[in-house]
């Protein structure tokens, strides 16, 4: 709790970030006082992986500054805000990939309450615009150019942000669910300053991607997380050759590539030539293996990785 963090910080003359980190380590059963692997775990993962975020910076984001969601319910859907409580932990960004091979999950928290836009379907949180979504999209927002196809509407964060860019001429959003489109069209799109750039298309993402033309950038965000996204990611990678002039970008791609690398390492550890190693093919030496298991190496073979890997 906030009281725990502030109390430890005061008593031990620590920053609130260090106090939060120590409390997280203790909650995970780590003993930093003992000379053990626990100290290495805390040093190598907790320190680079826990971040005290500034709520003012998030609230200054153009989407947060512009878009106001009404608290409405319609046809099983509810739109409004979800409160992130002080010191509540949440995913803050993509995995941090370090040169020594460490993959460090990024955890964030605020010292005050924060209200994040949210849509629920039948009581299940379906779409949000949290600091995690914001941080994991920033690089792909910066990369967007020309005519942009956006697969997956959500609450329109990506479409909003790229429509603000002068180097983006048009944004076509492909969404399968007509109820999501209706909510967005009624309550959110009218607040977009550059809504004249936005076109909404109700279609299946794969069907549309197989035949689309004239796009400079395509951004794919049709999954909730890594586990349900890997198979969809691999399917969409197979469709990239149909649009050779389009640059494809994928939400949380670094984390999905890391998951695929983990599956390859598991096959190596179990001395099993499974779907990943079959796709990787012969390996000359250790350096060749490292190159093939790198982010770029796995990205290059993603279109050939069997879909069954996502069901293991």
Language-model-derived ranges and their functions:
Residues 1-110:
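N-terminal auxiliary segments of SAM/dcSAM-dependent transferases
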Residues 113-118, 131-147:
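Conserved alpha-helix/loop element of class I SAM-dependent methyltransferases that forms part
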Residues 145-156:
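Conserved class I S-adenosyl-L-methionine
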Residues 146, 169, 216:
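Conserved acidic residues
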Residues 155-167:
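Conserved SAM-binding loop of SAM-dependent methyltransferases across substrates and taxa
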Residues 170-175:
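Conserved SAM-binding motif I beta-strand of class I
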Residues 177-217, 225:
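S-adenosyl-L-methionine
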Residues 224-312:
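C-terminal substrate-binding/active-site "lid" region of AdoMet-derived donor-dependent transferases
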